Amino acid sequence: MPDCAIIQGVTIVKRTAYPELATGDQVPQQHIRKATGADRQRISEIRFAVRENRPSNPALIERLVDWLFANSTVWVWEEDGVIQGFSAADPRDESICALFVHPCYERRGIGRALLPLACDVLKDSGYTTAVLSTEAGTRAERFYRTDGWTEVGCKEDGQIIFQKNVWGSTRCSSPSCS
């Protein structure tokens, strides 16, 4: 069986990620797209479901999602019609505002695929660097360090501020980007 299959002429899916599928079974269809207003509820659910970097007040999540849609470009990873993760970048201030994957779908490369798209939003807005912050001692901190982000400071609330050069980075090369 080949490593990849072309579905409907455009979506490439790695079959090796789903070894339980036998030949002839339906292969999940994955793609990344810009979020729409219809995605707000699912994005809120994902933001609430994460185990780390959780807001202390769940009511803040809806306001956060409203803010993301009003002030940033939001990308979603969708598989078989289910949004599994999202990223957002604010082109006004070189920041990556959000990168979250639902816990049920972690460790599958979704965050790694979404992050370059958020960086591209900033690059297209003329920035050479991107900044973001995350709680210390979390998986997110390790993820960003492994991805080449440099610690440049600390917020009053203890979150670590990271920065990365986006000018030399390449656009999302994942076949799932649409």
Task: Specify the residue positions occupied by each region the protein language model found.
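Short glycine/proline-centered loop/turn elements that form peptide/ligand docking sites
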Residues: 115, 137-140, 157-162
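Active-site acidic-Proline motif in GNAT/NAT acetyltransferases
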Residues: 102-108, 136
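Acetyl-CoA-dependent GNAT
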Residues: 30, 34-104, 115-116, 121, ...
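Conserved catalytic-core motifs of GNAT/GCN5-like acyltransferases
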Residues: 131-133, 145, 150-164
